[in-house]
Amino acid sequence: MPANYQQLAVVRRLVHDLNIPLKVVGVSTARERDGLAMSSRNRRLSLKQRALAPCLYRTLLAARQSIAYGERTAAAIKEGAAQVLQSVPEIKLEYFELVDPDTIRPVDVVNAPVRAALAAWIGKTRLIDNLYCEPRRCPVSKER
């Protein structure tokens, strides 16, 4: 959620519902070289915690890859992605969801683009991140 996609979705909905003549434009999440979403909260991390933090992005990438390779069941996608975090007990996952980009409601089946979104605690610092994920559309091969 561009560092906070949820806020972007709420503002877009507000502008739409109130018929405000504005175009709300989201931008990509700014990331450090190791994939960690840039945030003022990152300053609160110790050096050891900071070294663990890119695992959050790798978790989101695992979900994206699972979706790209054809997995459509949200539970299976989330379970696979959560395995990335299991190797890092210092990270306490608060939530990991696949949500509809417009409504921010969790989905059970991925048949359209979604946002993989998570929040986790590393020590006393809460970090959030999200990533756009799109199901791959593979052409049907013609058998002869």
Locate each region found by the language model:
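Phosphate/ribose-recognition catalytic cores of enzymes acting on nucleotide-derived substrates
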Residues: 80-144
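Nucleotidyltransferase catalytic core that binds NTPs
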Residues: 1-90, 99, 103, 131
